[in-house]
Regions:
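Conserved polymerase palm-domain catalytic core
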Residues: 9-115, 119-142, 148-149, 158, ...
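Right-hand nucleic-acid polymerase module
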Residues: 73, 102, 129, 157-276
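The conserved 3'-phosphoadenosine-5'-phosphosulfate
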Residues: 151-153
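Well-ordered mid-protein domain cores that form the structural environment of catalytic cofactors
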Residues: 1-6
Length: 276
């Protein structure tokens, strides 16, 4: 993801107008029969075909009515789409959009795509509108849609003086150039995500216990650090995440176990992974 965002900001230094969109319900709308056909045509090793087709046909487990209701509420339909979260999901998305990517390449558009998020760098507002028409027509051939252009929706046009958002990062004007950094909204999302670990209810709902708590929390933090290593304020992000880790751990042990953190010795703090 960081490579895609870095490519986008590099291209914006050449073409300052930005067209950004998000394919509507992409993974849920993938036509499985079309995907199976693409797998058979594009994957050379036939021995892999059945395995890949089986993976693409997987459904979300519904062990009880409550889980089934949640799945239905998300709009996930059986026998349609590819389930997000699988290691192969990005591979399937690239296979399914292969013809679209070729059309973009043939049209010589300066596009960066990451799964269902895409951004095209342009030289003018009119070019952005032309790109919008092109993308709609090309994606329609795959049975896919994108939202209409608006100032606050998922399809937007950004002028050279505006910060363009892509993959949770901002392509921010910085003098005559552009820099890549976290948007205020994404910083807040990260903060809320980490602070969820201080709620016992959240932990129980997500099968996090005393034995895997530290590993789960560190995994989420490591994911953010890996994804946003290209940010201009990466050092500040590291400090913020360290502070949130400490806050979560202190809050959890204080509120859940009534531990007086201030009375703990340095070894006790270290055992609970709390900075002294």
């Amino acid at each position: 993801m960081s490579d895609a965002a870095a490519s986008a900001v590099a291209l914006r230094n050449l073409k300052p107008w930005v067209y950004k969109t998000d394919i509507t319900k992409f993974f849920d709308e993938i036509n499985r029969e079309t995907l199976k056909d693409v797998i058979r045509r594009k994957v050379r090793h036939r021995s892999l075909h059945n395995m890949l087709i089986d993976a693409a046909s997987r459904e979300i487990s519904e062990p009880n009515k409550s889980r089934a209701a949640k799945v239905k509420k998300l709009g996930v339909m059986k026998n349609c789409g590819v389930r997000q979260g699988m290691p192969l999901s990005p591979f399937f998305s690239n296979l399914f959009l292969h013809e679209f990517d070729r059309a973009v390449e043939n049209a010589r558009l300066s596009m960066v795509r990451y799964a269902d998020d895409l951004i095209v760098l342009c030289s003018s507002h009119d070019e952005c509108l032309d790109v919008d028409s092109f993308c709609r027509n090309a994606l329609d051939k795959r049975g896919l849609k994108i939202p209409p252009i608006s100032e606050t929706g998922k399809t937007q046009v950004y002028a050279p003086s505006q910060t363009a958002e892509f993959l949770g990062l901002g392509l921010i004007p910085d003098g005559k150039k552009y820099k890549l950094d976290l948007t205020t909204e994404q910083k807040e999302k990260i903060r809320r995500r980490i602070l969820q670990f201080s709620s016992v209810t959240y932990l129980a709902d997500n099968r996090v216990n005393i034995f895997n708590f530290g590993r789960k929390l560190d995994g989420v933090i490591a994911g953010y650090l890996g994804s946003y290593s290209c940010c201009a304020s990466f050092n500040d992000l590291e400090k913020t995440l360290d502070g949130l880790r400490s806050k979560v751990t202190r809050t959890l042990f204080k509120d859940t176990f009534n531990i007086d953190i201030s009375a703990l010795s340095p070894p006790g703090l270290a055992f609970l992974c709390i900075p002294d």
